[in-house]
Amino acid sequence: VPVTVRFSNFAGVPTVPDTDTLASPRGMAIRFKLPDGTDSDLVAHSFNGFPTPTTDDLRQLLIAIAGSGPQAAKPTALDRYLDAHPIAKTFLTTQKGPPVSYATLPYFGVNSFKFTNAAGASRFARYQIIPVAGEQLLDKDQVASAGPNYLIEEIGKRVAAAPVRFKLVAQLAEGGDKIDDPSIAWPDTHKTIDLGEIVIDRPVANNDAEQRALLFLPTALPAGIEPADPMLTARSEAYPISFSRRHGSQ
């Protein structure tokens, strides 16, 4: 199945250097071009978890961030929010350092899906994308010497030298797991099912224009896979709005 992959940084601000703490977690989005002509999208990031359990909580976090600029009185709205929400504080303060490459990080689809087979049996699962090259982070000296756009430069050279490979797996839910709470990571001891291998073997012809034209929708799913977390629906409703604003349509 042909795929298109987009890597990204967290902040959504193009001027944030790749070495900045605001750039993590990193993102990996995959579009599968299915045989019937439709697309299916998978969106993941490099932290196994999410800062909030619901979209309402996420809204409150974003409001707190917006009201906590450099001139805000202490404690800021964000300080107060994080004091009351330890999971969000952990998310914002325990990110990994800059990676050697986008190809040397694992990525996690933190929202759950319901998978149903032809016999009607269903299981809940979350996606994980595991780098065949293993996880590799920069050391302090490498961070100090890295350029602001080193990741996009590195991945281009890496793909030109040899295909980049990831394992795609599904981590199965077990009894007691929070199916609709992406802020709670499931234990690493849970069984995983190998779904296949993602192979990136060439860049697109016009990378800058092509990546700006991509809109990934996590509810674009094939038959047999359904959203099991209401946040997925909210994300698919919000992403087209941000997409249109980036392109000046709104």
Language model feature labels by segment:
Residues 1-250:
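Active-site-adjacent core segments of small-molecule enzymes
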